[in-house]
Amino acid sequence: MTDRTREPLAVEGGRPIRDRFLVFGAPDIRREEIEAVVRTLEDGWIGTGPRVAEFEDEFRRYVGTAHAVAVSSCTAGLHLSLIALGVKPGDEVIVPSMTFVATANAVVHVGATPVLVDCERETMNIDPSAVERAITPRTRVIVPVHFAGRPADLTALEAIARPRGIRLLEDAAHGVETIHRGRKAGTMGDCAAFSFYVTKNVITGEGGMVTTGDEEIASWIKVAGLHGMSKDAWKRYSASGSWFYE
């Protein structure tokens, strides 16, 4: 058996380990999905419209939450959720050290400070004891990530956050089908952001969804996601009336 640990790396002229290109994202797209996309193109509703509303309703019912709001990405969902939860410049938001950069970037986007804490070796999820040690008077939100679909310990995090008035925002980018003690991801925090990027197990190419049980949060995110316009896009051309600008 050849000892390949002594060979030079492929970038240095050595023999590549793989003979075929490793595809970054390989979604299972079948005829049903292709036909659904074609129907959407033929209908003319390429952006926010009836099919998006249908998707929101189906996703809400699947997760088991009161509200689901479609957004352009999970990153946008995290960003909007942080604002909806009242995070402002100077505040601190606790995030895990093992996560995609968007988790921390969303915090930076609102002018707050991401505080990275250690993860558990066994689960790769945020360590509740590390979270508790990192809390300061400026802590406003904790953002647990369900890493690789394994649920973060929301029970422990709730016990830490709720008595202190700290909000919980689930980064559920990996969290479709994730369940923690009988509760689905997207129902355990104040709100949650899901990803439908090409590498996820439910995809829309790009795209995301925010779920919440709070009607005020859902309404704000829906309006803010449409640049503050308060009339649903698909109602502009309906019998309910014309589009008005103020």
Give the location of each predicted region.
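Active-site region of PLP-dependent enzymes
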Residues: G175-R181, M188-E246
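Alpha-helix N-cap/helix-start capping motif
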Residues: G49, T75, S97-M98, P151, ...
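PLP-dependent aminotransferase-like
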Residues: I83-A172, I179
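Phosphate-binding glycine-rich loop
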Residues: W45-E92, N105-V110, V115-D118, R183
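N-terminal "arm"/small-domain region of PLP-dependent enzymes with the aminotransferase-like
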Residues: M1-I46, P50
